[in-house]
Amino acid sequence: MTVITYGKSTFAGNAKTRRHERRRKLAIERDTICNIIDSIFGCDAPDASQEVKAKRIDRVTKAISLAGTRQKEVEGGSVLLPGVALYAAGHRKSKQITAR
């Protein structure tokens, strides 16, 4: 009888962890290259803490400003004709049409 032995895989993670590990290595390399270039030219990299946050708008002001964009004006084109509704509803019984 043959004995089957199960060995461990080369990497115990899944595709997501392997991708994150690969991207982490690339990000570290990119950061070191940027730091070397900045040190050569004497530039300081902007910190993430120096970012200016967008001004918050209260919900009433936001609703008022967006109300005008929701309403679209009809410029023409498909306009409802007065007698179209009489003939459009074929599945309903029409009392006004006598020619059957």
Swiss-Prot record:
One of its GO terms (biological process) is DNA-templated transcription termination. This is Probable regulatory protein N. N protein regulates the transition from the early to the middle stage of lytic development. It comes from Salmonella phage P22 (Bacteriophage P22). Keywords: Transcription, Transcription regulation, Transcription termination.
